[in-house]
Amino acid sequence: MSIAAKDIEPGDIPGNLTGGEFSPYHVFSAEEWSRFRADTPLTLTGEEVKRLRSLNDPVDLGEVRRIYLSLSRLLSAHVEASQILFQQRKRFLSMSDETKTPFVIGIAGSVAVGKSTTARILAELLARWPSSPKVDLITTDGFLYPNAILQRDNMMDRKGFPESYDIGALLRFLSAIKAGRPNVKAPTYSHLTYDVIPDQFQLIDRPDILIFEGINVLQSRDLPADGKIVPMVSDFFDFSIYIDAEESLIHNWYVSRFMRLRETAFQNPQSFFHRYSTISEDAARAIAEGLWHNINLKNLHQNIQPTRPRADLILQKGPSHLTQTVALRKL
């Protein structure tokens, strides 16, 4: 059964991308999108999905069937096309010893919108393709400046904003990945201590696919006045995904997650946020609201949401945290 995509219209995606005949996207309902799965097999179990999803994220096996199997099939087509192009370019350049570099998938979106769940589920699905590709997953958290530096520069309340990341290190990492270098080091981050872990790295050794997840990975920057060439993080992506939802929903998810963490991870005395587990529920909720409005909402408006139109694919979630529409950029 063929499915006719509709052009994106005002209101289909929050923030309104270009509508009508000049739209750069096709938009599908979740049910329409699910039919693109075709014969893609379901290779995850319900228990595995529970293990992969983040706290307070209700994504289940049904959502994997509806959304992720079709997305897996689409990404398989893109990876296959990149491999064909690579072989053609090798012949064109007469470079028989050239090695294919990783296919890099960027995943962006607000805090609490479900980026990590999407990244982990995709990583598992892609690794279980018949070709058994090697898939690695990296988050941008490890590229944040250590808390000591953020505190020194009075930037702790700007954590997660573009200036709180070591962009130089991040770009060097991606450059090495795309150069095909082996054993590239990525710094690691502890959500328990809310800080980069000193001298601890994740080694990325020439995977077939690298998933790179973070709130600002589609961020662009002003061109430098001196005219120097400055690459953007997204310049290294072969495919990009933006996880979207109405602002009010993300707000509710963020506060709800904070309150759940107060009852779980924050109980650990080593947690950076342990102090929030000892105050009243009303006081904790007020703090969560303050963090949302004073930090995360500002970051969403100023830096994250404006990058949405740069994505190849936009997953728009509804109140249940499940995807309602899928926008796919036209070729």
UniProtKB/Swiss-Prot annotation:
GO biological process: coenzyme A biosynthetic process
Gene Ontology annotations for the cellular component aspect, listed alphabetically: cytoplasm
EC number in record: 2.7.1.33
Residues annotated as binding ATP: 109-116
Major enzyme class: transferase
Gene Ontology MF terms: ATP binding; pantothenate kinase activity
Catalytic activity: (R)-pantothenate + ATP = (R)-4'-phosphopantothenate + ADP + H(+)
Disulfide bond in keyword set: no
Chief subcellular location: cytoplasm
Coiled coil: none
Keywords, ordered alphabetically: ATP-binding, Coenzyme A biosynthesis, Cytoplasm, Kinase, Nucleotide-binding, Transferase
Xref: CDD domains: PanK
Compartments, record wording: Cytoplasm
Pathway: Cofactor biosynthesis; coenzyme A biosynthesis; CoA from (R)-pantothenate: step 1/5
Family recorded in the similarity comment: Belongs to the prokaryotic pantothenate kinase family.
HAMAP family: Pantothen_kinase_1 (MF_00215)
PANTHER family on file: URIDINE KINASE
Name this polypeptide is given: Pantothenate kinase
